[in-house]
C-alpha cells in the first residue's frame, strides 16, 4: 500500500476515472472540483471509497499532494494551479497516469478537425477485425477507468490539445495528427 498522496482536480469523466485507478493502485486519493460533480460520478467515487469535495478547493489538502492529476478543462492560470506550480508539485494528465498501468497498445489521434470521425472509424475497424479494443479520451470512457476496471489489448484514444498538456512519458504506439489550424 502506497502512502503517496494523489490529488485529482476535476470530478468529471477524466478525473473520476483517474481517482478510481489511483485508489485501486493503493494511493491516498483526494478529488476536488470547484464546480458541482454529477451524481453518476459521485456514485462511482463513493463505490470505490474515494474521498471528494465539490464547489470548493481545500488548499491544505490539495497542496499536500505528492502528485496532482489535472483534468483537461482546468486552466494552468487558475489560482490553485498557480499555487501548485509555486510548490513544484508535479502535475500530470489522466492519460499520462493511466499509461503507467497498462501494457496495451495505444493508438492516439489528435489535430484540429476530424479527430472524432477518425477515432471512431479506427475503433470500428479494429473491433471488426476481432481485436479487444477500448475507446477513450474525448470519446468513450475514461482511459484510467478502463485500465482500472477492464482489460483491452488496444486503446484508441482521441486527444484534444488540452489533453496533450501534462503528458511527459506516455508513449503512443501509433500517433495520428489530423489537420492543424491556427486555433490549435
Regions found by a protein language model. Give the residues of each.
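Phosphate-binding loop of NTP-binding sites
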Residues: 60-63, 72-184
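N-terminal leader/targeting and accessory segments in enzymes
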Residues: 1-93, 97
Amino acid at each position: 500500500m502506497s502512502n503517496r498522496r494523489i490529488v485529482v482536480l476535476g470530478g468529471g469523466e477524466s478525473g473520476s476515472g483517474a481517482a478510481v485507478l489511483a485508489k485501486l493502485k493503493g494511493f491516498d486519493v483526494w478529488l476536488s472540483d470547484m464546480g458541482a460533480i454529477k451524481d453518476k460520478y459521485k456514485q462511482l467515487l463513493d463505490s470505490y471509497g474515494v474521498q471528494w469535495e465539490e464547489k470548493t478547493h481545500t488548499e491544505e489538502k490539495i497542496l499536500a499532494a505528492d502528485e496532482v492529476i489535472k483534468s483537461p478543462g482546468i486552466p494552468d492560470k487558475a489560482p490553485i494551479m498557480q499555487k501548485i506550480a509555486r510548490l513544484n508539485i508535479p502535475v500530470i494528465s489522466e492519460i499520462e497516469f493511466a499509461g503507467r498501468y497498462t501494457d496495451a497498445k495505444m493508438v492516439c489521434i489528435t489535430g484540429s478537425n476530424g479527430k472524432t470521425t477518425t477515432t471512431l472509424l479506427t475503433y470500428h475497424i479494429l473491433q471488426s477485425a476481432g481485436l479487444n479494443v477500448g475507446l477513450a479520451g474525448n470519446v468513450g470512457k475514461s482511459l484510467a477507468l478502463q485500465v482500472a476496471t477492464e482489460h483491452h489489448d488496444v486503446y484508441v484514444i482521441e486527444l484534444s490539445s488540452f489533453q496533450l498538456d501534462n503528458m511527459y512519458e506516455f508513449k503512443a504506439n501509433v500517433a495520428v495528427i489530423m489537420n492543424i489550424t491556427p486555433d490549435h
